Amino acid sequence: GELGADPSRVAVIAATGAKLLAHHLAGSKIKGVDRGLQAGDVIKVGRSVELECLDTPGHTMCHICLRSHTDAPALFSGDTLFNAGAGNCHNGGDPAALYATFVEQLAKLPGNTQVYPGHDYIENNLKFTLAREPDNAAAQDLLPQVIGQDPAHGRVTTLAQEKEFNAFFRLASPSLIATLRKSFPELPEQPDAKTVFVKLRELRNKW
C-alpha cells in the first residue's frame, strides 16, 4: 500500500511541516517521500543529534536502521532486529538477506550499542529462544524480568546482551543446533550458519 498516505502520518506532516524520509527505493510504496535515504546518509535532528542510515534488507528489501554515534551508541532497528528476535519476511522480504544483514552489519556494531526496536516482542522471543536452546542461562534469567512489562518502559538491551540470548545471533550453539535438527532431521550435524538462521526464521513464523 501507499504507506505515506496513512492518515496519522499525513496529519503529523501537516501540523509540523516535517519532511518524510524513507529508503531511496521505497518511493513506489510510500507516497510523498521528500528524501530518499541510502547507506551512510546522515539525518540531523536539532543541533546535537545525528543518525547514520544503515541499509538493512531482509524484513523488507527497502528497510533502514538508524545508528546514533554518541558515548552511549544506539540502534533504532525498526522491524529488522527485535529484543531477542528478528523481523519476519512476510512483506516482500527475504530470510537470506536478513541473515546477511545480521552477520555483515548488526553483529559488527559495538557491543555497548543499545537496541531500540519498532515493537516489543521480548517475552515471546525469549520463550522461542528457550524452546530452541533450553540451556540458555541468559534467556532463563531475563524472561521473568520482562513478563508483562509495559512496552513504554521496556527493557533496553545492548548488542552484546543480544548475542547471549537472541537465537538469531547464536547460530553456532551446539544445543540450538541439536534442537533444530529434531525439527529438520535432514540437516547435517554441523549445518552452516545461514541455514540455521533461515530454519529458525521458518520456525518463528509459526511460533
Predicted regions and their residues:
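Core dinuclear metal-dependent hydrolase active-site scaffold
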Residues: 42-71, 105-108
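A short acidic, helix-capping loop that chelates divalent metal ions and anchors anionic groups
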Residues: 28-31, 84-91, 125
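Conserved beta-strand hairpin/beta-sheet module of binuclear metal-dependent hydrolase folds
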Residues: 65-78, 84
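Accessory terminal helices/loops
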Residues: 100-114, 121-207
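Active-site HxH/HxHxD metal-binding segment of metal-dependent hydrolases
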Residues: 1-52, 72-73, 141, 145
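Histidine-centered catalytic micro-motifs
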Residues: 1-5, 54-62, 116-122
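Active-site metal-binding loops of divalent metal-dependent hydrolases
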Residues: 1, 25-26, 59-60, 80-81, ...
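Divalent metal-coordination and catalytic microenvironments
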Residues: 37, 56-59, 79, 98, ...
